[in-house]
Amino acid sequence: MKAYTYIEKGNFALIEKHKPELQASTDAIVRVSLSSICSSDLHIKHGSVPRAVPGITVGHEMVGVVEETGSDVKGVKPGDRVTVNVETFCGECFYCQHGYVNNCTSPHGGWALGCRIDGGQTEYVRVPLATQGLNRIPDNVTDEQALFVGDVLATGFWAARISEISNEDTVLIIGAGPTGICTLICAMLKQPKRIIVCEPSEERRNFVKQHYPDVLLTTPDECFDFVHENSDHGGADRVLEVAGAKTTFRLAWQCARPNAIVTVVALYDEAQILPLPDMYGKNLTFKTGGVDGCDCEQVLQLIEQGKIDTTPLITHRFPLSRIDEAYRIFENKEDGVIKIAIYNE
């Protein structure tokens, strides 16, 4: 089978590999229908994910059809269409029992697929701990509707949940990339008083304006003044930082009102400064909103009910045979790209 593979720093290639086989009674084999490219895949390509193993098939955003299951797999069976969770988790340790599956203590736990073991930009993938890692897609939900459930949409849903958004809040979302838009969609479910999106790209601001016309828009240079002019208490009640740029962490806490919650969803390439003397007296609560795949079943239900739709994010579609081209477009942000669906021919 064809598999897009991490050869070495700066080099991914589509190569031939053997179809995976079950290695444990808790495994499942999934025939990949659709996969997608994530910025984390680019981090692997650039060598900034030390735990990534050269030789692995990359990709952790995927949906597919269950081909085979181990004897201890529950909840799914061959023939089921499923989402695949980016996180591998046991469901039994302290963190899993408390809903923090991102911090699973199993040796297999955490980000394994497409990082430490073969992932989904291929034709077939082995999913460890499949009872927890697979969710059946409802019959009236398409593969494209479900494509982002296991990663970028799970991130946005978790971030909105831990931000404790109320209907009286002004919510500021910094960044309108794929994760930022998924975070926006999930924040909208909370029905806050207003949502402001800060994004430097005119192209992406126009995307938000087209699809979410009730959202207020600003740029990083104008954000501080804009938020103060469009909030009730001298700043945003909830700030969700999804950009991860050099200046956006500082912008996030500066735009927050006193006693606000600032949720950091973004990953940073370098250390950030927490200037406590500058923010003394603001009494801010900081939270981090990394991927936590504990809500995938609920997210699928919301998609089924028509309350979440991420299909507008799919701006491009490519067969697996042209995945090099897809990566070039995604990495260089060409042609208005937001997300790319990779399908098997």
Functional labels for PLM-detected ranges:
Residues 1, 200, 225-226, 250-254, ...:
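C-terminal hydrophobic helical "lid"/dimerization subdomain
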Residues 20-35, 48-97, 138-141:
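Glycine-rich beta-strand-centered segment in the early N-terminal region that forms part
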Residues 38, 85-135, 139:
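Cysteine-cluster motifs in flexible loop/terminal segments that predominantly coordinate metals
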Residues 75-78, 167, 258:
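Short, flexible surface segments
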Residues 79, 168, 213-214, 235-236, ...:
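Local beta-strand N-terminus motif with an aromatic residue
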Residues 136-221:
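Mid-domain Rossmann-like dinucleotide-binding core that forms the NAD(H)/NADP(H) cofactor-binding site
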Residues 163, 205-285:
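Glycine-rich cofactor phosphate-binding loops and adjacent beta1-alpha1 units
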Residues 199, 266, 290:
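Conserved acidic E/D residue at the C-terminus of a beta-strand in Rossmann-like folds
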